Amino acid sequence: MYYGKSRVPKGIFSAGLDAGLILDVPYIGYLLQNGKQNILVDTGIHDNNIVNGKAWGGYPAEGGNKYVIEALKKEGLSTKDIDTVIYTHFHHDHTGGALLFKEAATYYQKDEFLNLLNPLPTQKNRCDYNIKTVDDFALIKNHCIVDGDLELPNGLKLYKLPGHTLAG
């Protein structure tokens, strides 16, 4: 699902390579459907991470809740149709629409939440996390905190894969 994009120089990902190449990097999520169950993986970038059409690093960007709502609409769904939300990790471009799904069962890794509460200095410098996420998640009604791998009742398997972040 397309939740918007940021337009950035490739060099921020691969210093010294492809100087001058500009990339459109999408904010994405996934919709998993099993019969009548609708599972959303990640919820896009926070509205407040895009200011005057710019996001992380001051690069042009578009996204936010209206993009999440529009992506669902293209699938014939609304926010109320989502039963479950799974977060791969808690970076600001993956958790922005959390409040759209306050009633949904919400799965995330314990280590990821702990890292959100206490980010490493480099994570603070890069602004990986949006501190508003803590307040947003306080309003979610059905937390399913995962500590490692887990198989959901519908057979979907969640695996803890640290690397990009401590848990995802």
Stretches with model-predicted labels:
Residues Y27-G29, D147-D149, G168:
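Short, acidic/polar N-cap/turn motifs at the starts of alpha helices
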Residues G58-Y108:
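Active-site metal-binding motif and surrounding structural segment of the metallo-beta-lactamase
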Residues V51, G97, L117-L120:
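A short secondary-structure junction signal
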Residues I22-V25, P162-L166:
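A short catalytic or substrate-binding loop motif that flags glycine-/basic-rich loops and adjacent residues
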Residues L40-T43, D83-H89, Y108-Q109, K160-G163:
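Active-site neighborhood of phospho(di)ester-bond hydrolases with catalytic His/Asp-centered motifs
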Residues N48, F90-T95, T165-G168:
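Active-site environment of divalent metal-dependent phosphoester hydrolases
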Residues G63-L77, D81, D111-K160:
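Metallo-beta-lactamase
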Residues G4-E70:
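Conserved beta-strand hairpin/beta-sheet module of binuclear metal-dependent hydrolase folds
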